[in-house]
Amino acid sequence: SDGYGPIVKEVAEKHPEIQFCVPTGDNANQDPVLSNYHNCYGTIYQGRYVCGVVAGVKLKEMIENGIITPEQAKIGYVAAFPYAEVISGYTAFYLGVRSVVPEATRLDYYTDTWSNYSMEKQVATELIAQDCVLISQHSDTIGPATACESAGGSIPVYHVGYNQSMTDVAPTRSLVSSCVDYSYYFEQSIYALLHGKKIEDCIDGKTYGQDA
């Protein structure tokens, strides 16, 4: 999704008879504004807060079972870029964790890439080496999850994913993943086209210009 916007917008300008919708795009309201080019994205920070609560419950369980002390409730976050979307996401996640375990602390590491399996796995491994007992991510590969699954040591390292379930690659360490369900958006987009309406006028949610 990220990075496709400029190219798709160029194509949309050449084909005004077709509606183009780019999830996670950010240029629909930039000049030239096209009536057939749209961006959409979910309020993923809300899902990340819920995932943080789940992570906090696991940390609390580990504390109560004597696996870690409250001071050892350290979480690591594999982040792609220092964008507002990423920062709001890990902030929401951290607040969710601390709503259950107030003593929890966090380490962040930016990879400067959305999709690099080996780098994301290495970053997660380094965070684990710095005593993080739970890893989450705002990046696109399974690298962090596999790092948690393969981590040795006496303390298990759990994982909270993004965009997809990680249970296949981390069956003993994956807790939950935050994902955006675009089905409603595209159902309403189709409805809008069938009834001659503007897509954003048919979305029951926050919209701004060509963005929903």
Show the residue positions of the predicted features.
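A residue-level marker of the well-folded mature domains of exported/periplasmic proteins
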Residues: 1-212
